[in-house]
């Protein structure tokens, strides 16, 4: 895998860590897309994770791969509440309709993209290396 996006698509469950006051919070995510030269995730505006990202947009993604590799992406996220980004997310992952039956018209569904992110691939057997996002 040559990019962070490829890694996350091949290993679709990853964890998103945020800050809640003075405590770290992590939870599993499963959606990622490359769109308009940006790496996107999505969530629900009513969830604590979104509120935490609004208050402190510095987050980190961590995903485990095969053969003792793992990926970390650290950076800020910004909201893209455009209909086009939401529509693209449902096009790329129709299973999201099980969670958001109204699709891109769901007012609680939100897409976010990384800004200034650094992706690093780690291994138990070799030195860490930076990867392009996509």
Annotate each language-model stretch with its function.
Residues 6-21, 59-63:
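A short, Trp-centered hydrophobic/proline-enriched beta-strand micro-motif
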Residues 11, 56, 93:
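Acidic-histidine catalytic/liganding microenvironments
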Residues 13, 38, 58, 76, ...:
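Structural motif
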């Amino acid at each position: 895998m040559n990019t962070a996006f490829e890694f996350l698509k091949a290993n679709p469950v990853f964890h998103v860590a945020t800050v809640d006051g003075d405590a770290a919070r992590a939870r599993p995510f499963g959606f990622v897309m490359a769109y308009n030269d940006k790496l996107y995730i999505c969530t629900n505006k009513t969830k604590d994770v979104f509120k935490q990202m609004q208050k402190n947009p510095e987050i980190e993604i961590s995903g485990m791969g095969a053969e003792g590799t793992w990926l970390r992406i650290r950076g800020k996220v910004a909201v893209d509440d455009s209909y086009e980004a939401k529509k693209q997310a449902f096009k790329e992952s129709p299973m999201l309709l099980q969670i958001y039956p109204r699709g891109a018209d769901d007012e609680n569904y939100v897409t976010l993209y990384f800004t200034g992110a650094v992706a690093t691939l780690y291994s138990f057997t070799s030195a860490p290396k930076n990867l392009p996002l996509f």
